[in-house]
Amino acid sequence: MATDRPGLGPAFPRVPALSLGSWNTWDRMEFGDAVALIARAAELGYAFFDVAHYDMGPHAEGSTTDQIFGRAVREAGLAREDWLYCGKLWLWDYPNVGFTQQMNTSLERVGVESADVVVVGDYFGEIDLERVVADVAEQIEAGRFRAWGVNNWRIDDLRKAFDIARKRGLAPPVFAQLKYGLARRSMAEGEFYAPLFASGQLTLQASDIFEGGLLVGNLKPNRKIGADVGGIREKIAGAWPTVRKIAAELDASPAQLGIAFCLANPATANVLVGVSRQAQLEDNAGAIALLERVGADRIRELTRELWLDREVAADGTW
């Protein structure tokens, strides 16, 4: 069943199948449309929002998308206990800008007292894992959030983080937010991360599933797209006609096909979607029915040749 999915650790055994959010979600629409989109997401049971302060490292762009979201969610009338907030902690200027400072800033900008979960972001070079794990635990102890995950971490560092948490009796990461979808599968389904998902040590939060819109036919996206790991973006754009053809065969939209593929993986807790219009949200929600109607095995069979990152390192190294 499409509804039989894992959660994000013991604190969140059930989460919505879809999570709204991306770099530019809330600053790509009129404010009233943002309010209506949030309200409709809650009505559909998808009141899970991935929201971050993007003003550090390669994301130093002075974005206001998080502030817009904070105002919009209040205007939509959602009580804080009725929606889930997934935040970000960045390692780009860590520990110069520590997690306490980052959380203070993020929570103030959104206008809430705490998040529910956070993702500790990706990085270049080496990081002080002992300090990262301890500092995350400090934020959990302070009530800033209840669980944490990692974003595209190198597998060796992730394993070290597990060991540190176990030895020190601290909270380990419970999910991984990974690039995952029709075209990019190597990391989530490869020999390194897949055993962690299979054992239940981690669950998967799928991100970048449409490659910035390329896999739903937007071949000239006007928004930022995540890193092109492996340099395969041109190949991904070239796969669009095949995606469209398979979706048509299933009497579904390309977006529904892409989301259903992610949810067909039993490790997937939920899928991040960067909708900026209510019509997109309504369409995306149809992915659940598609998966129930067609089945995971059939979807994977039909999309087998769309796996385009087979030669990309599965261990998180670039």
Language-model features, listed with the residues they occupy:
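Conserved, mostly hydrophobic/aromatic
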Residues: 20, 34, 41, 49, ...
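N-terminal binding-site loop/beta-alpha segment at the start of enzyme catalytic domains
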Residues: 1-81, 141
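Beta/alpha (TIM)-barrel catalytic core signal, keyed to glycine-rich beta->alpha loops juxtaposed to Asp/Glu
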Residues: 123-306, 310-313, 317-318
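Charged helix-capping and loop-helix junction motifs
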Residues: 33-36, 63-68, 100-102, 130-136, ...
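Acidic (Asp/Glu)-rich catalytic clusters
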Residues: 9-14, 42-43, 70-82, 104-113, ...
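Active-site mouth loops of central-metabolism enzymes
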Residues: 21-32, 87-97, 121-122, 126-127
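Short, acidic/polar
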Residues: 29-41, 95-111, 129, 158-163
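Active-site groove signature of glycoside hydrolases
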Residues: 108-126
